[in-house]
Amino acid sequence: MNIFLSCTKEKESKRCRAHEMYMPSSLFSKSYTYAKTLNPDKMYILSAKHHLLPLSREIAPYNYTLKDASAEERKEWAEEVVKQMKSHGVDFNAKTYFFAGEAYIEYLREYFPNRKEMYAGKGIGEIMHWLDKKLGSVKESLSNWLKIYSNKDSVENYIE
């Protein structure tokens, strides 16, 4: 399974790893947290400046977004992203989740027949509400699991 998260306008003010750079954004931090629960084989950030960005790559803050780019620039950006995906061994036929807006997905769609666009048709408020619900379900499941397995008697009863 592949997961691609888009970069965000809100960023750290200092050089850091890519997944840390965008954490000041509630949208990114919630998307990243939820995406990690899906246990992907590959997970990258789609960066307007850096194209395909491994989570641990160190980068400096920048101020550029694809929303300001022309259609031709977005198409060239996507071609470079696909080239980088190939060099990173991304399986284009694998189930793929995009946590990204239209500008980041429009020219990548054709490469991923088994894609799911997590933000499609939703406004920012809907996306945030949806992520809150998803993260709430994950938290509740984890809490229930911990209750069951943290009690020795419960574990023994479960095994028998």
Q: For each of these PLM feature ranges, what is it?
A:
Residues 1-160:
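Peripheral peptide segments
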